[in-house]
Amino acid sequence: MTMKYIYKYIVAAAFMLSVSGVSAYGQEYKDLVEKAMDYTRKDSLQQAEQLYQQALKLDPKNARNALLFSNLGTVQRRMGKIDDALQSYTLALNIIPYSTAILLNRATIYMEKGMLDKAYLDYCNVIDLLPEDKEARLFRAYIYMQRRQYKEARIDYNVIIGKDFGNKPARIGLAMLDQKEEKYVSATDRINLLIHDYPEDASLLKMRANLELEQGQDEAALADLEAAVRREPSSGETYELMGDICLRLKKKAEARKYYEEAIQSGVSRASLSDKLKKCR
């Protein structure tokens, strides 16, 4: 989730409070909210959380509380209080159920918690309200892919591409879809274009290597993995895979070198003992 939503409702709440006439009772509510917003801007999140909670207790029926619950949820999310943030966003949506910003915030938490079905519903609601919202389309497409609903995922990615032809995540998503559906020529063409546009992105080279491995192109896959590790440090699993490819190609010295790299990157020597024996 981008940071563009974090202060959106803080600003809105400040505006609503500033233009409203307030009683002495309302003044206390207003002061608590203003102090909470100030603490939020200063990253004093615990104090901000407490002040938002005080304001909500002071006037639990205030129509502006949807914005306060949303702000509170964002503060709690930044504090790592994910369950509390989820509850706060839900309380906000109970008051203003068609807020796309709050729906997106709650959906992100559902995704983090692995609650994909609930995230899916929030993303669908956002898309009903804003059919071209990229974030909702991207994450809904991801959920569709997890469900193996490839046709639906492709529709979402294509909606994004239709408005933003160069959108990198959507282009990657379409390449992955082609690969899953064994449309290898199309998948390769898409990944080649991505690598052309983002030549320093090692993850794209690894994607192409994986595609090449599925087609039995070990030499090409090894070349891409070697190029990837030159661009950025890689995981032990990547080096282990490179060792496995070298063993299949009967390049034992190179295989041993990559297995040793894997061990240095965190893979246990014991788990590679049999493979190392094959390198003799």
Predicted regions and their residues:
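Terminal, low-structured helical/coil segments at or just beyond the last alpha-helical repeat
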Residues: 29, 240-244, 248-280
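Helix-start (N-cap) detector for alpha-helical repeat units in TPR-like alpha-solenoids
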Residues: 29-30, 63-67, 100-101, 134-135, ...
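Register position in tetratricopeptide repeats
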Residues: 41-42, 75-78, 112-113, 146-147, ...
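Structural marker of alpha-solenoid helical repeat scaffolds
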Residues: 58-61, 95, 129, 163-164, ...
